[in-house]
């Protein structure tokens, strides 16, 4: 949908989010007579046309008081970011440049508006929920670092001194993991034996990873690491995941180094809202906290 769509009443809000599906939804909370809201309105409208892969909604806090209270809106303009009806971020104020940077940041992580047909109904690509600042990769090469495997392009992650990699992936809220995609080249450098650990209290080293019992161990085939491959996880063991550590022990062809073209997780957020955003108790209209 191109353009900003006003949300007329509280009952209309959730259906609009549902309609956005896995696409990024940017919701502007505004108020009639609010100067900063009026100032940023032309830029917000322009962004809705510039980024047609996202959905842009506008909510008046007086018309939709229930929606504003549920989302803990204390000032206008406030911009909330949703995906699959899950609140993933927010931005406050009338700085159009800062808002656009935030939108671009989330669209860079966009798994694509064309939903993968191999993702089961009810699950989603969790790439937008990965907290890149909390990620770490040991034994990555200087030329081909970790960030490369979070992008669907020709770049790749490659190990440095030997074939092993130790990757920690942090999420910005608890998630349930159903499966993962683990793509690699067909030249023998793709990953083979992988140990998965979750919610470790601290970073582990290679020696610890070798001797520790994983949450799940994988033996990947060449088919598993193709572009359309899906690697199932033991869903019951991945019900409340804040971080995942992947120990890549070896590759398909016993090559000197291992390459990973792309990986992501398939699953769902544990809850439809990030409770860290709801620490403030919503008071009566006009009260400040």
From Swiss-Prot:
Keyword Transferase recorded: no
Any one GO molecular function term: protein-disulfide reductase activity
Subcellular location as annotated: Cytoplasm; Nucleus
SS bonds (residue pairs): 34-37
Keywords, ordered alphabetically: Cytoplasm, Disulfide bond, Electron transport, Nucleus, Phosphoprotein, Proteasome, Redox-active center, Transport
Domain of life, per lineage: Eukaryota
Thioredoxin domain location: 2-109
Protein name, UniProt field: Thioredoxin-like protein 1
Organism: Rattus norvegicus (Rat)
Highest classification ranks of the organism: Eukaryota, Metazoa, Chordata, Craniata, Vertebrata
């Amino acid at each position: 949908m191109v353009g900003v769509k006003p949300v007329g009443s509280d009952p209309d809000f959730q259906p609009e989010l549902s309609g956005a599906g896995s696409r990024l939804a940017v919701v502007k909370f505004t108020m009639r007579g609010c100067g900063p809201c009026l100032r940023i309105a032309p830029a917000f409208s322009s962004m809705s046309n510039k980024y047609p892969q996202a959905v842009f909604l506008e909510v008046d806090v007086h018309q939709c008081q229930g929606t504003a209270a549920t989302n803990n809106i204390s000032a206008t303009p406030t911009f909330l970011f949703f995906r699959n009806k899950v609140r993933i971020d927010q931005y406050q104020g009338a700085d159009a440049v800062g808002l656009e940077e935030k939108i671009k940041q989330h669209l860079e992580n966009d798994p694509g508006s064309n939903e993968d047909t191999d993702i089961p109904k009810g699950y989603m690509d969790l790439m937008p929920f990965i907290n890149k600042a909390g990620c770490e990769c040991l034994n990555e090469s200087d030329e081909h670092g970790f960030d490369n495997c979070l992008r669907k392009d020709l770049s790749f992650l490659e190990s440095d001194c030997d074939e092993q990699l130790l990757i920690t992936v942090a999420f910005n809220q608890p998630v349930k993991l159903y499966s993962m995609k683990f793509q690699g080249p067909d030249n023998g450098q793709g990953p083979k034996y992988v140990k998965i650990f979750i919610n470790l209290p601290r970073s582990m080293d290679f020696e610890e990873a070798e001797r520790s019992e994983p949450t799940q161990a994988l033996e990947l085939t060449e088919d598993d690491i193709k572009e359309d491959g899906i690697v199932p996880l033991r869903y019951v063991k991945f019900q409340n995941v804040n971080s995942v550590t992947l120990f890549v022990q070896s590759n398909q062809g016993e090559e000197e180094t291992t390459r990973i073209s792309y990986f992501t997780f398939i699953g769902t957020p544990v809850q439809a809202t990030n409770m860290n955003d709801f620490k403030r108790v919503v008071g009566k209209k006009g009260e400040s906290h």
